[in-house]
């Protein structure tokens, strides 16, 4: 063999025109090093340098061009000289130009002398100029522009990674806690992006137009006078606007700002060129945001679902393998987290094993049942207490802090404390860890939903109470009359004392004279037309006048006369009741109740209170507990880090539910607080940093891993649920409630949606508006909803049917693939005689074949003998046919044919779910039994095909052999000339009686077909003939493998000859030795798998890829591409077919072998024989080395002459 690293020359076989005898050729071993050096000396050093640079080029996707011209071309020609190749396309030339430019760029970094670099650069530039001359300048500029654009896009993609917010922080958390914890922060960032989008929409279409309209309003304008009551802060409110209680309740400056619903006016904004209706924009933006949120969530879920469906169905078959190979998180970089994940995987395997095993019966099941019942009763009691507490907080009245913020504080405490109590109660139930996590999530979700709707109900009750108070305040308390409407009169009753003589009492009345003073008129009367007011305004709503008239009343003086000493003074005590004073909103005192702002203030306080409670809980529960566990552990009686209270866990599921609940509050309060998403953005940013700091400082990964990556749509399903829950109260308010008359953009409407009808009336015809009203009536909407429900049901049924059909097709493909693999492995390792036919996991009765008679072809016998497999112990590469089945045989226990027939006659037993589906009409009751019958029939059909495959006639068997061995016709060698006569005589008669002889193969190959003929070799003794009758027919393939794997010799007779096996006990599969003999008994019989020509090992060794792997030469890709010639052309013309037929007839008449066949493209040569296996030397040691060389096919063979 040549030395490693040298360029090995090609081996050429020179044949004469007649093809009678082949001249001797040189083998690879006969090529001297001087000849190799002489060939290498003809190669230019500059070209070698360019080749080395070209071999290191980054353009690896460009495949080298294979020259298909004359096979006798010189391999040492200039590889870059392609000027004569006029058939090259422009794209190919551009690729070559790009390659040469890369070579020039890499030339500077090569460790060469400067003279060598300059010389190489000169040659490369010259070739580059030649190639560029073949392409127009515009094409070059276009290619260069495309390349620069690709580089710019890659640079932008790399820059985009640095622009993603908190990407580095999330990756750091991922390295410490894994992808499960980082998925929460990724979801947190996604929710923040949604809130930023919602804020942008509300600011662009609602907030900014209202702010522009107010900025253009001046003091005394019509808009200023109409909006003064809702936009100008009264002096009494301004005096308390800076107090902490006012700011905490979002009053004062917050109340009279763009933050709440009541600040927006119902006036139309008249710009310089446009007329913008803010109420219409307010209504449509809220509806659009809800629809937009639903769309992006569904879009994200669909994308995750598409990625999830790419996984194969094998994940449901090999559960433990998938758990083992996919259970590790390779993003972890923290040893502590790695230990937690390791233990989690161990627990996961234990759980899976326990699930598969039969669960033992519980000794005391009633104790567990009672504990679970009590636990669920206690949890239900907690739900009732939560509802009662929220309802009671809504009825509290008072001026103190707790009364004003009772609802927000109560909901925040319940949200914070109750999930931890649920977790403790769940441990009493002793559920499976996976089920315990599911129950925990379900209970927390139910708690959030109850709190959500209890809050809405409490707010509605407060609204009704305030509405009643407002209606009571509308009644007049006192009536003030005009001063000129009554005449003042003073009456004095005097009781005179009785004189001593005459004690008769007398009563005297005195009347004060009343004088009337004329009042001059300060203003003249104005004549007003019926349709116009006093100011010339059309159809005024109200008119306010001011009267400065001064009234003067007469002064009446009374004087007491007569003695008063005998008057008796009587004191009368009278108590007048005083009414209770209640705190009312300023909007109510100004003539109306703005209940939308009140609800918005409550929701805003709830959102901000949740932020305060979350930060406080992180600081107290996580941070202080972590400090105590860290620094008090040395002085405590037990281990604080491992028992109680231990470090806080980062609970992904609870944190996700908390985030989803917060987003539901945002969707609920968006209609009443347009800038609530902006406040939520600030809250989410604060929580991102707080939770990230707590995770890296105080928390440890949860012991029970929440697999969010396996069900990535879990987060978004919760968002969909809360979005649906928040649309119900908002829709109820829009459809049934009456807007406030004193504030908001819908103050002059009877309903919130009336603003749409007003716009339609103003811009459309009355007939068209009436048609729209009729189309939106309940008589049309209800049938449409029913129709949509039926369509949805039909689509669901269709999708279910398609999914079932998809599963059936996947199962069929799996079965077909399994059968094909079985056939391939049978061809690779020899057909194995099946004592038990195992199809679809069920045992079939053994089919006994009758013994062969004299009229049966020997090919059938050889086929049956070939199916007999020897022991597979010790084999290295022969796979087991039982392990290739991809069907999950979970219930494939062995059953007899009698039990199968009995079971098939009985109706299938349906589960509870199947009965329910059959009851509601979603499933066919016959499909369950019919599906099994179809599988049994298909399995039986395939079994009959496999069992009767060996009983076909000899013609079908020969065609099957020839088709199977077509792929090996370039590798299997022919036999020598000495066995041609015997092979010709035996090939003429195919149906002969079997005799005590040994079988061997003759391979006759022409450009169209490959003929495989079994031959018989008569034994020299009767004893040997009797033993040879029982010799397995796999020795035929062993002989072919021996001819294939024998060392390369210098003559055709040795190379294509065949040695007759004289003794059947001699192992024909032993490796070749230095004396070209196959008698070395070192190779054990099980290693026949490596020598089988149909085995996958031999196929792999004959593949062209092994030429690159096993060879030690350093030839370039271009050189290797030229080494593989095209296959010989298949003749199609009548002349060629006649010539081939004539050659065949001549060969059959002469009884001789045709001319020397075309040499194979591949040759496998082996090193010296393998050593016997030992402790130091394994049977698969690297001493055995396979090398494959590609040879050139000779010229087109001409017509051969017979001897």
UniProtKB/Swiss-Prot annotation:
Domain of life: Eukaryota
Membrane-crossing residue ranges in chain numbering: 191-213, 276-298, 369-391, 406-428, 441-463, 665-687, 714-736, 780-802
Renumbered residue ranges of the record's region Disordered: 1-39, 64-90, 826-908, 927-1039, 1059-1087, 1112-1203
Compositional bias annotation for Polar residues: 865-874, 1061-1076
Low complexity bias spans: 898-908, 973-997, 1022-1035
Compositionally biased intervals (Basic and acidic residues): 927-945, 1133-1147, 1172-1203
Subcellular location: Membrane
Cellular component GO terms, alphabetical: plasma membrane
One of the record's GO molecular function terms: mechanosensitive monoatomic ion channel activity
Key word Cytoplasm present: no
Bias (Acidic residues): 73-86
Family: Belongs to the TMC family.
Function: Probable ion channel.
Protein name: Transmembrane channel-like protein 2
Annotated gene: tmc-2
């Amino acid at each position: 063999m040549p030395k490693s690293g040298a360029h090995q020359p090609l081996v050429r076989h020179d044949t004469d025109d007649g093809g009678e005898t082949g001249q001797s050729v040189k083998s690879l071993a006969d090529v001297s090093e001087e000849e190799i050096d002489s060939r290498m000396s003809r190669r230019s050093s500059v070209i070698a340098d360019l080749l080395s640079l070209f071999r290191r080029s980054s353009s690896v996707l460009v495949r080298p061009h294979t020259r298909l011209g004359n096979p006798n071309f010189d391999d040492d020609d200039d590889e870059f000289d392609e000027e004569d190749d006029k058939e090259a396309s422009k794209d190919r030339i551009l690729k070559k130009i790009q390659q040469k430019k890369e070579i020039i760029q890499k030339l500077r970094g090569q460790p060469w002398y400067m003279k060598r670099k300059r010389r190489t650069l000169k040659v490369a530039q010259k070739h580059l100029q030649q190639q560029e001359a073949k392409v127009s300048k515009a094409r070059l500029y276009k290619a260069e522009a495309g390349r620069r654009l690709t580089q710019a896009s890659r640079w932008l993609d790399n820059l985009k990674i640095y622009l993603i917010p908190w990407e580095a922080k999330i990756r750091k958390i991922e390295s410490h806690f894994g992808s499960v914890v980082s998925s929460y922060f990724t979801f947190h960032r996604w929710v923040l992006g949604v809130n930023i989008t919602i804020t942008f929409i509300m600011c662009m279409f609602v907030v900014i137009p209202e702010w522009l309209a107010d900025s253009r309003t001046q003091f005394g304008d019509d808009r200023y006078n109409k909006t003064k009551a809702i936009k100008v802060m009264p002096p009494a409110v301004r005096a308390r606007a800076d107090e902490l209680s006012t700011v905490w309740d979002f009053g004062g400056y917050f109340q009279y700002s763009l933050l709440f619903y009541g600040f927006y006016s119902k006036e139309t904004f008249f710009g310089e060129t446009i007329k913008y209706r803010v109420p219409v924009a307010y209504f449509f933006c809220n509806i659009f945001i809800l629809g937009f949120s639903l769309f992006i969530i569904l879009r994200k879920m669909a994308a995750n679902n598409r990625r999830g469906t790419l996984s194969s169905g094998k994940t449901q078959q090999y559960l433990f393998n998938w758990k083992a190979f996919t259970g590790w998180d390779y993003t972890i970089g923290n040893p502590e987290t790695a230990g937690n994940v390791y233990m989690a995987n161990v627990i996961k395997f234990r759980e899976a094993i326990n699930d598969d095993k039969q669960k033992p019966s519980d000794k005391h099941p009633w104790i567990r049942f009672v504990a679970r019942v009590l636990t669920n009763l206690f949890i239900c009691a907690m739900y009732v207490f939560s509802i009662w507490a929220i309802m009671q907080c809504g009825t509290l009245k008072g001026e103190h802090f707790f009364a004003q913020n009772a609802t927000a504080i109560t909901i925040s405490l319940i949200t914070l404390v109750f999930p931890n109590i649920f977790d403790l109660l769940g441990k009493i139930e002793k559920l499976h860890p996976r089920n315990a996590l599911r129950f925990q999530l379900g209970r927390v979700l139910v708690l959030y939903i109850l709190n959500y709707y209890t809050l809405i109900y409490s707010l509605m009750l407060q609204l009704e109470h305030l509405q009643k108070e407002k209606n009571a305040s509308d009644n007049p308390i006192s009536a003030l009359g005009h001063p000129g409407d009554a005449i003042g009169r003073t009456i004095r009753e005097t009781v005179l004392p009785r004189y001593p003589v005459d004690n008769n009492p007398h009563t005297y009345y005195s009347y004060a004279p009343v004088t009337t003073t004329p009042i001059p008129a300060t203003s003249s009367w104005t004549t007003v037309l019926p349709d116009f007011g006093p100011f010339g305004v059309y159809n005024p709503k109200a008119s306010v006048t001011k009267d400065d008239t001064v009234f003067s009343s007469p002064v009446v003086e009374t004087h007491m006369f007569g003695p008063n000493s005998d008057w008796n003074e009587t004191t009368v005590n009278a108590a007048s009741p005083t009414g209770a004073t209640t705190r009312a909103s300023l909007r109510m005192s100004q003539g109306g109740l703005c209940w939308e702002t009140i609800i918005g203030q409550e929701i805003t306080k709830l959102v901000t209170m949740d932020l305060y409670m979350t930060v406080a809980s992180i600081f107290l529960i996580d941070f202080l507990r972590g400090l105590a566990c860290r620094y008090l552990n040395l002085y405590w009686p037990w281990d604080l880090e491992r028992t109680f209270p231990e470090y806080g866990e980062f609970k992904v599921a609870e944190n996700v539910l908390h985030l989803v609940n917060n987003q539901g509050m945002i969707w609920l309060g968006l209609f009443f607080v347009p800038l609530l998403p902006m406040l939520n953005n600030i809250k989410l940013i604060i929580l991102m940093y707080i939770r990230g700091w707590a995770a890296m400082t105080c928390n440890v990964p949860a012991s029970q891993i929440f697999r969010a990556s396996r069900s990535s749509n879990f987060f978004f399903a919760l968002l969909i649920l809360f979005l649906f829950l928040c649309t119900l109260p908002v829709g109820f308010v829009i459809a049934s409630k009456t807007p406030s008359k004193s504030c908001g953009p819908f103050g002059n409407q009877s309903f919130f949606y009336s603003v749409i009808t007003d716009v339609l009336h103003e811009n459309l015809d009355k007939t068209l508006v009436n048609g729209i009203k009729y189309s939106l009536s309940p008589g049309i909407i209800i049938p449409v909803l029913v129709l949509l429900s039926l369509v949805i049901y039909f689509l669901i049924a269709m999708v279910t049917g398609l999914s079932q059909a998809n599963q059936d097709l996947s199962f069929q493909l799996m079965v077909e693939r399994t059968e094909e693999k079985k056939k391939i492995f049978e061809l690779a390792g020899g057909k194995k005689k099946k004592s038990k036919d195992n199809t679809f996991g069920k045992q079939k009765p053994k089919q006994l074949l009758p013994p062969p008679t004299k009229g049966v072809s020997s090919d059938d016998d050889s086929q049956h003998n070939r199916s007999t497999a020897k022991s597979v112990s010790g084999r290295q590469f022969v796979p087991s046919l039982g392990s290739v089945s991809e069907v999950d045989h979970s219930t494939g226990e062995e059953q007899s044919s009698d039990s199968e027939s009995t079971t098939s006659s009985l109706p299938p037993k349906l589960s509870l779910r199947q009965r329910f589906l059959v009851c509601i009409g979603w499933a066919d009751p016959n499909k369950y039994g019919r599906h099994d019958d179809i599988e049994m029939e298909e399995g039986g059909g395939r079994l009959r095909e496999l069992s009767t495959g060996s009983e076909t006639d000899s013609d079908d068997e020969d065609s099957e052999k020839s088709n199977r061995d077509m792929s090996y016709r370039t590798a299997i060698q022919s036999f020598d000339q000495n066995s041609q006569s015997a092979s010709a005589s035996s090939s003429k008669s195919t149906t002969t009686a079997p005799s005590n002889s040994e079988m061997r193969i003759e391979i006759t190959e022409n450009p169209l077909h490959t003929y495989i003929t079994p031959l018989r070799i008569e034994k020299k003794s009767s004893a040997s003939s009797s033993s040879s009758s029982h010799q397995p027919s796999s020795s035929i393939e062993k002989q072919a493998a021996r001819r294939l794997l024998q060392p390369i010799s210098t003559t055709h007779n040795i190379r294509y000859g065949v040695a007759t096996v004289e003794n059947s006990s001699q192992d024909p599969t032993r490796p070749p030795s230095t004396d070209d003999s196959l008698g070395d008994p070192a190779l054990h019989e099980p290693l026949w798998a490596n020598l089988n020509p149909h085995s996958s090992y031999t196929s792999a060794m004959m593949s062209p890829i092994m030429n690159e792997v096993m060879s030690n030469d350093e030839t370039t890709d271009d050189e290797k591409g030229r080494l593989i010639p095209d296959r010989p052309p298949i003749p199609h013309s009548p002349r060629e077919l006649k010539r081939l037929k004539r050659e065949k007839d001549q060969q059959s008449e002469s009884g001789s072998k045709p001319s020397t066949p075309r040499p194979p493209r591949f040759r496998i040569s082996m090193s010296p024989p393998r050593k016997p296996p030992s402790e130091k030397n394994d049977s698969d040691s690297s001493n055995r080395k396979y090398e494959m060389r590609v040879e050139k096919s000779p010229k087109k063979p001409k017509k051969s002459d017979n001897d």
